[in-house]
Amino acid sequence: MIENTIIKANNTGRKAAIFYLEFPSLHLVELAAHVGFDAINIDGEHGYFPTEAIDNICRVANGYNMSVTARVPDSTPYWVNLFLDRGVQGLSLIHI
């Protein structure tokens, strides 16, 4: 299981640094890892993220020991499960 780096940072007494990703870019995920971000947040509500992109972002971020959270386009079970099945560790649900 991938450790939740947001909770880990908070447990050590500091706020987690989270990189906000508005479009799919593995280069930005790697750059965020190299400059010290703790996690990636995917903006699936305002940006377009195909399932393959979500898979790849989670894979690369987890390889750098970063958690991935996401804002899903809709709070229906389809979207929630699609993001969770890809490896996202936390969700922001909209319009609840």
Where are these regions (language model features)?
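Glycine-rich, proline-tolerant flexible connector loops at the mouths of alpha/beta enzymes
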Residues: 28, 35-55
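Glycine-enriched alpha-helix->loop->beta-strand junction motifs that scaffold or abut catalytic
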Residues: 35-39, 85-90
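N-terminal amphipathic alpha-helix/helix-capping segment at the start of soluble metabolic enzymes
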Residues: 1-19
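Glycine-rich beta-to-alpha transition loops that act as phosphate-gripper elements at the mouths
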Residues: 21-24, 70-77
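Catalytic cores of alpha/beta
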Residues: 77-86
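Hydrophobic faces of well-ordered beta-strands that scaffold small-molecule active sites
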Residues: 17-19, 40-42, 68-70, 91
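Active-site-adjacent beta->alpha loops and helix N-cap segments on the catalytic face
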Residues: 2-4, 46-60, 75-78
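Conserved small/polar residues in nucleotide/adenosyl-binding loops
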Residues: 94-96
